[in-house]
Amino acid sequence: MAFAISKRNATLFLVTLLLISVPLSSSTLQQDFVKCLVDNSDVSFPITASFFSPDQNATLFKEELESTAQNLRYLTPSNPKPVFIFEPLYETHVQAAVVCAKKLQLHLRLRSGGHDYEGLSFVAEDETPFVIVDLSKLRQVDVDLDSNSAWAHAGATIGEVYYRIQEKSQTHGFPAGLCSSLGIGGHLVGGAYGSMMRKFGLGADNVLDARIVDANGQILDRAAMGEDVFWAIRGGGGGSFGVILAWKIKLVPVPATVTVFTVTKTLEQDGTKVLYKWEQIADKLDDDLFIRVIISPASKTTKPGNRTISMSYQAQFLGDSNRLLQVMQKSFPELGLTKKDCTEMSWIKSVMYIAGFPNSAAPEALLAGKSLFKNHFKAKSDFVKEPIPVEGLEGLWERFLEEDSPLTIWNPYGGMMSRISESEIPFPHRNGTLFKIQWLSTWQDGKVSEERHMKWIREMYSYMEQYVSKNPRQAYVNYRDLDLGTNEGETDAREWGAKYYKGNFERLVKIKGEFDPDNFFRHEQSVPTKIG
């Protein structure tokens, strides 16, 4: 005898199976959450595969918790763990998760790519109990060449977005991140810089619409959320205003031929002199040219302890090598770029080159969605308004040679970045910025040497204060740094807020207070509902 089972009855049946299978020691909170999901979600799903908890399966829970975490410093046994991890399969599940977390007084942490530098997408030091809503299953990307746009769901990585664009066209791209495993949900909400920023601005500058879930569990698009909230979510930092479900992004034109190169200089090859020249011209180069500098200690010989400083100039040029060589000869001959240093390729292959993939890798490698580099690390950031003098660089090299595995990456500004108002979106670092610095200290032995490395990067950061932006000393919110202050700390939010957002911080606070007055979406450095 044939019969039909409704979606709701099927879901109830699955819930019953789940609750039967959960040991008695399992969290009652998870059971209550599951029941609430059924009452508030109208789409059935394999619920047993959408939850991960230590009571059900400690091994799977650990694997899921660690699956996308970029900073291993926050995966030690002493770090707080969520009661469970929930992976929504549909947008209505996200709505229900917000409603149920609010009802059960559970704190939410939202994770798309897991790249938060201070682990705020998967660790909550001051909020218990907390759960993670992991958006990695919401990863559809729909490209529409007729409108030069695409809808990208929050769980998609930047690499997936790039891949789906090039599936449809070899002459369209999107100006976002250099690291292909970044989740686009959290990436764009912090601004999102990349190798085409000098030509087209930030990723957030090229957002046309968005879909979010607010603190009441409602799905809102740009029209429904209003222009103030739409302004706030494009650079105002993750975890403050709602759950990003999807972004509508504007595609940009890219040439059929893109040229890349990497040229490395050391101290023995007049590296400091060449870098000082780069500081003076990097923001003034042709808008099609992006040259970043990756700086770290390197061995001069095979003898241990015999180290120098390596400065690798890595570039993407939106054009062929002949035109690139003309630009370089005119603007930066000191680098000594030659034809054999240059490699012509498609835009998608240039994205992979910058991200660190081997030349032999096919574009499908972008779909893996896993980070190529994981470490214990501490990061900081700076913006530079005047060239750092040679003596300042030499002092920096002395400090770098004292540390095991330091790294700094200098990204040029100028071009379109200087032509967009600093209040256009919350990201304010625009005209007058020569370049942005990312500081990193990395290590592999966990807690054993953490204190030493943290001490080093803080002292180095203090040394560099004299050479970087002032009043305020600016920072990039996607390089989250809790040393700047927290909502529960002694530092006034206006101090760290001004570092990230400058004069835009007060507007963000006003919007937050009106849109999420109960501060449901919060973390250690979220935008507060009020200040002072």
UniProtKB/Swiss-Prot annotation:
Question: Per the record's keyword annotation, is NAD included, yes or no?
Answer: no
Co-factor requirement: FAD
Where found, per UniProt?
Secreted, Cell wall
Q: Which PROSITE patterns match?
A: FAD_PCMH
**Tissue specificity comment:** Expressed in sepals and stamen.
Tell me the keywords, alphabetical order: Cell wall, Disulfide bond, FAD, Flavoprotein, Glycoprotein, NADP, Nucleotide-binding, Oxidoreductase, Secreted, Signal
Iron-sulfur in keyword set: no
- What post-translational events are described? The FAD cofactor is bound via a bicovalent 6-S-cysteinyl, 8alpha-N1-histidyl FAD linkage.
Pfam families on file: BBE (PF08031), FAD_binding_4 (PF01565)
Domain FAD-binding PCMH-type, chain residue ranges per copy: 76-254
Show the disulfide pairing: C36-C100
State the Gene3D superfamilies in the record.
3.30.465.10, 3.40.462.20, Uridine Diphospho-n-acetylenolpyruvylglucosamine Reductase, domain 2 (3.30.43.10)
Report the GO terms under cellular component. extracellular region; plant-type cell wall; plasmodesma
Range of residues in the leader sequence: 1-27
Q: Which superkingdom heads the taxonomic lineage of this protein's source?
A: Eukaryota
An example molecular function term from Gene Ontology annotations? coniferyl-alcohol dehydrogenase activity
EC class of the enzyme, as a word: oxidoreductase
- State the EC number(s): 1.1.99.-
Annotated crosslink 6-(S-cysteinyl)-8alpha-(pros-histidyl)-FAD (His-Cys) location? H115-C179
- The protein's recorded glycosylation sites are N57, N306, N431
Reactions catalysed, as given in the entry: (E)-4-coumaroyl alcohol + A = (E)-4-coumaraldehyde + AH2; (E)-coniferol + A = (E)-coniferaldehyde + AH2; (E)-sinapyl alcohol + A = (E)-sinapaldehyde + AH2; 4-O-(beta-D-glucosyl)-(E)-coniferol + A = 4-O-(beta-D-glucosyl)-4-(E)-coniferyl aldehyde + AH2
- Gene deleted: what happens? Endosperm development arrest and impaired polar nuclei fusion.
According to the record, cofactor stoichiometry and binding are noted as:
Binds 1 FAD per subunit in a bicovalent manner.
Functional note: Required for endosperm development and polar nuclei fusion. Mediates oxidation of p-hydroxylated derivatives of cinnamyl alcohol (i.e. the monolignols p-coumaryl-, coniferyl-, and sinapyl alcohol) to their corresponding aldehydes. Can also use the beta-O-glycosylated form of coniferyl alcohol (coniferin) as substrate, but is much less efficient towards cinnamyl alcohol. The electron acceptor required for these reactions is not known, but does not seem to be dioxygen.
Identify the PANTHER family for this entry: OS08G0158400 PROTEIN
* UniProt name for this protein: Monolignol oxidoreductase AtBBE-like 15
